[in-house]
């Protein structure tokens, strides 16, 4: 959408009126239509002030083509090799989101059914490592819906990573107590029960058992934290933890109500993408 602003000047640097019109730019290709239908479609478009049929600017397209080729080359650069399929699954089990994966075998894989998406878990662990490198982090959290595709076994490129994580999120560090961390997981599970499978949480340095049949506040059990020595210990609800997550759920989105209540003094945008 491109905005058009009409702001007449009074000749002295001011103005006494302001008007505008948003324009939705659309192409002129309308598909294959009979002549009368094509004429009717064009007339309808012309009658809509917000719609503007626009042809690509040849000079701008030529400039952009050079950069598009560079983006294509950058996207082809290898960054890793996946030794096996990294399956996509938002929610473990067979009752919700059981056919998310596009890779053969992933939807029936026993590990995926029991534990959820491999690729979501990998993203959560990557967030944790980035947080530990830049400012420190005890745990990480990623919503299952923020990860969009599987990764097939074989070379992984920059382009693959952008497809897995297509959103322009940044990593945010939050300070919260163990009790608030537990409440955050309960928030996410409540959102899942309400029908939002994308809220299902994946974490680095945290593990738990979940029973979605239980009421709110009782769905998370055996919640443990992997400490700096690599040992799994019970989460201390009175202790303070530094959690790295994406800015979307840090703001309380996707049902993460508790995170949205944290004050500015307890959050830091790292600006890491």
Question: Which residue stretches match the model-derived regions?
Answer:
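Secretory-pathway-linked proteins and extracytosolic
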Residues: 71
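Feature captures C-terminal
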Residues: 1-46, 50-54, 61-64, 100-102, ...
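Glycine-rich phosphate/diphosphate-binding loops and the adjacent beta-loop-alpha structural elements
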Residues: 75-116
């Amino acid at each position: 959408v491109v905005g058009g602003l009409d702001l007449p000047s009074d000749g002295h640097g001011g103005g006494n009126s302001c008007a505008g019109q948003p324009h939705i730019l659309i192409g002129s290709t309308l598909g294959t239509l009979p002549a009368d239908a094509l004429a009717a479609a064009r007339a309808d478009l012309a009658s809509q002030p917000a719609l503007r049929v626009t042809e690509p600017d040849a000079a701008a397209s030529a400039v952009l083509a050079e950069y598009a080729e560079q983006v294509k080359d950058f996207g082809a650069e290898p960054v890793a090799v996946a030794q096996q399929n990294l399956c996509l699954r938002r929610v473990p089990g067979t009752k919700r989101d059981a056919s998310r994966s596009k890779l053969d075998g992933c939807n029936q894989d026993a590990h995926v059914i029991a534990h959820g998406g491999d690729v979501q878990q990998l993203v959560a662990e990557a967030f944790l490592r980035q947080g530990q490198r830049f400012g420190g982090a005890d745990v990480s959290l990623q919503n299952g819906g923020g990860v969009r595709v599987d990764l097939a076994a074989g070379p992984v490129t920059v382009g693959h990573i952008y497809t897995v994580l297509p959103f322009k999120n940044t990593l945010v560090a939050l300070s919260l107590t163990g009790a608030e961390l537990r409440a955050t997981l309960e928030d996410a599970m409540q959102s899942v029960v309400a029908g939002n499978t994308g809220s299902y949480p994946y974490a680095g340095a945290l593990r738990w058992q979940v029973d979605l049949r239980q009421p709110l506040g009782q769905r998370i059990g055996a919640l443990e934290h992997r400490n700096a020595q690599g040992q799994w210990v019970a989460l201390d609800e009175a202790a303070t933890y530094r959690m790295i997550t994406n800015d979307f759920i840090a703001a309380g989105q996707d049902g993460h109500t508790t995170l949205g209540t944290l004050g500015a003094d307890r959050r830091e945008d790292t600006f890491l993408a």
